[in-house]
From Swiss-Prot:
Belongs to the SmpB family. PANTHER family: SSRA-BINDING PROTEIN, TMRNA-BINDING COMPONENT OF TRANS-TRANSLATION TAGGING COMPLEX. GO terms for molecular function: RNA binding. The lineage of its organism: Bacteria, Pseudomonadati, Pseudomonadota, Alphaproteobacteria, Hyphomicrobiales. The gene is smpB. It comes from Methylobacterium radiotolerans (strain ATCC 27329 / DSM 1819 / JCM 2831 / NBRC 15690 / NCIMB 10815 / 0-1). This is SsrA-binding protein.
Length: 157
């Protein structure tokens, strides 16, 4: 029997700064409730989640401040570009994330927006704790040292 192909993920938006500003301790995948024009705009590859975060709104978890531009072909039926979007998670997952943000000083940040192999828009969420300035500098030093070490090993070998 042939091995299963790895699921394809077409990444639309990537929040690379989140791993710099936060120590990500847990990640999970969530669906996102979108309108038709938002899906069309995402399929065009345009979205920004650099300033986005997830937080509670009533009993749901919402994605705030994520920018999905208007779809150019839809004239008067377009969506609001920075509206709060509902995240589709199980109740137990929502309660866990809300509890962590309220008690322990954690933040839920979106790491990626992508389309899965079934064509559904998904958000990869990270539960992270903010880094101090000295932690960020330490991470940069460690990354530079790893790069230099790899370069030295490559030149010797």
């Amino acid at each position: 029997m042939a091995p299963k192909p790895e699921p394809s993920r077409r990444i639309v938006a990537d929040n690379r700064a989140a791993r710099y500003h936060y120590t990500i301790e847990d990640t999970l995948e969530a669906g996102i409730a979108l309108t038709g024009t938002e899906v069309k705009s995402l399929r065009g590859g345009k979205a920004t989640i650099g300033e986005a975060y997830a937080g509670p709104s009533g009993t749901d978890l919402m994605l705030f401040n994520a920018y999905i531009p208007e779809y150019l072909e839809a004239n008067r039926f377009n969506h609001d570009t920075k509206r709060p979007r509902r995240l589709l998670l199980h109740r137990r997952q929502i309660n866990k994330l809300i509890g962590a943000t309220q008690r322990q000083g954690y933040t839920v940040v979106p790491l990626k927006i992508y389309f899965n192999d079934k064509g559904r828009a998904k958000v990869e969420l990270g539960l992270g704790k903010g880094k101090q300035a000295h932690d960020k500098r330490e991470a940069v030093k460690e990354r530079d040292w790893q790069r230099d070490r790899a370069r030295l090993m490559r030149d010797r070998g």
